[in-house]
Amino acid sequence: MRLSLGREFVLFWSGQTVSLVGDRITVFVVPTLMIFALDASPFEVGVVSMAQYLGIPLLGPIAGVLVDRWNKRVTMLVCDLVRLAAIAAVPIAYWAGVLTTPLLFVCVALVSGATIFFNVGYLVAVPATVPQDRLVHAYSRLEGSRTVSEVAGPSIAAGLYHALGAAALLVDAATYLVSAACFTAMRPWGTATVHQGSVRSRLALGFRLNWADPVLRRVVVAAVTLNSGGPVFVTVLPVLAYQGLGVQVAAYGAAMSAAAVGAVLGALAAPRIGARLGLGRTMAWALLLHCLVGLGVLAAPALPPPVVIGVTIGCYGFFMSCINVCSAPIRQSRMPAENQGVMHAAFRTATWGVIPLAALAGGSAVTLLTPGLGVLDAARVVMAVGTLLAALSFLPALGIQPLLDRAERERVLNGSTA
């Protein structure tokens, strides 16, 4: 029986699905544009990749505090419009002949900043529009949309870049307009949940809540470890493909699209796996396997590079979907609604704050190693080191399921004695 998640969630889900396809276009086009149109070095690719996450350490600490005080729906609508303007500025600058790496850095950083506020509202939006007993199914659909966008996005992006060049980014700008229209059509929700307390006190509360809870603490440590190595792999991948392996844009786009089928399957399978094994156990093993399968990229160029990239990233995405579907319900189950905004913001600040440094480290390391090893071997070494570092995230995650089981036993016991 198919669960109904309600009109408000359907609007939210629809807007996000369209916008996510546009996001994948930008994620694909920006490094491609840099490498082929701006002749960027791996270091410059790493710098702009860093900008994608720069808003996290700069704005993350206060985003949750402020969003708790604001109307979430209106906040997310405004964020969509800001991102629309920033993305549209890139092709305009290119046509005017003034697009440079620093300007691209600024535009991407603006998108990053708006996305920080949007994502805090995003995590509050789902429980605000969906009943508690349907949260996992709602997140599964959202994760399915994310992974469907990864299937369609790269091939669409490759075709659009071939036909339009920098103008392909205007498609992403248009998707933000669609998302904003969906928010406008929704009934009012997401009013301010906190009206008292200073920004500093609320911020401190968010970090305390994440660290004081034993489950949240393990999730934080696992996520920090994952994000210390994973972005190295992701940042260096287009450098490996284009400059190291000589993969063409169309072939790379096709490989990424074909690979993302695995991520779609992960989003569909995660609720069933989580129900059978437990969310915590599923998350832990998904973390380990997500990282280890990344080593498969080392099979190129011995095997055809597009095939290797497609299969590797497909498995990579399958397990990432499992992680995402399991992580959010685990965290939300440990926190009351009035503190979820600040808790999520503190979580993102702590766990995503390392991503800019990891992305910069990946690009810098390839640049430093290339003179001695060549770009192919330099990229392979850096990606392998980043992947193995991320695999250590499995260790703290192993203890999550026993804590969840204990909490459930206590809940049942308290309910039976009430």
List where the protein language model places each region.
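Alpha-helical transmembrane-bundle signature of multi-pass membrane transport and export proteins
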Residues: 1-418
